[in-house]
């Protein structure tokens, strides 16, 4: 009874502490590091990606400190992914920042509105994050220029991760896919790695402000499978890649 009575207050306090991390850690620790990277790094884009990775690794370490009943399990094979287009199911706001925390060299798709936010937008642009137009409209004028750049980036060992559902699932089921990620993989002759994310929505549900701090949760990220360049992804329509990716995600959810 005591726990149920005070749980909303505890959820609010921990939520505010987690959001406070964004402000305090950025202002006092990471903004000076980003500024130094902008001025002195030989490869500014890669330096910003690395700083973003560290920023969110610290965030999840802080989350586990405040919420000791939350465990995070990452399959060893996930850390080894390089030079790939990564797709994953999408359950929570935590999903993209969790993937950022796993890969020092990464790019992803960010809503256009975030690029307009002062300072935050500068960080996103400097890290080389992409506009949704690249995956939503295959006829954008500079598509081939961006594809050429992406091909070189992937060849250097970087990863591009995308949530092909385009929005968080409210039911937990895998939603309809957009074809953009699969088109990029085809044009770049890049393999697709399919990741299964589980239980992030139990910690930070869609459409909620408060973190759910009162239940034991094991968040996991596992490699559901791969679609190689010569496995239907690089030949013909991206539809084959979409179908196989869905099969891998839906199949892994039954285990």
Question: What function would you assign to each model-found segment?
Answer:
Residues 44-47, 233-238:
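Short, conserved charged micro-motifs
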């Amino acid at each position: 009874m005591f726990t149920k009575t005070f749980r909303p207050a505890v959820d609010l306090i921990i939520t505010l502490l987690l959001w406070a991390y964004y402000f305090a850690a950025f202002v006092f620790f990471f903004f000076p590091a980003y500024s130094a990277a902008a001025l002195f790094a030989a490869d500014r884009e890669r330096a910003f990606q690395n700083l973003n990775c560290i920023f969110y690794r610290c965030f999840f370490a802080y989350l586990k400190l405040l919420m000791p009943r939350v465990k995070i399990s990452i399959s060893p094979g996930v850390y080894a992914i390089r030079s790939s287009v990564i797709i994953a199911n999408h359950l929570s706001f935590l999903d993209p920042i969790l993937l950022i925390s796993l890969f020092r060299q990464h790019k992803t798709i960010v809503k256009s509105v975030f690029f307009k936010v002062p300072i935050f937008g500068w960080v996103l642009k400097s890290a080389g994050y992409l506009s949704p137009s690249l995956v939503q409209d295959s006829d954008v004028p500079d598509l081939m220029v961006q594809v050429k750049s992406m091909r070189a980036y992937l060849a250097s060992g970087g990863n591009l991760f995308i949530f092909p559902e385009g929005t968080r699932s409210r039911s937990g089921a895998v939603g309809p896919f957009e074809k953009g990620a699969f088109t990029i993989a085809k044009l770049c002759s890049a393999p697709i790695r399919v990741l299964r994310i589980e239980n992030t929505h139990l910690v930070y549900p869609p459409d909620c402000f408060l973190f759910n701090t009162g239940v034991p949760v094991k968040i996991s990220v596992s490699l559901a499978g791969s679609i190689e360049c010569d496995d239907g992804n690089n030949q013909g329509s991206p539809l084959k890649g979409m179908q196989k990716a869905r099969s891998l995600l839906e199949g892994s959810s039954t285990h």
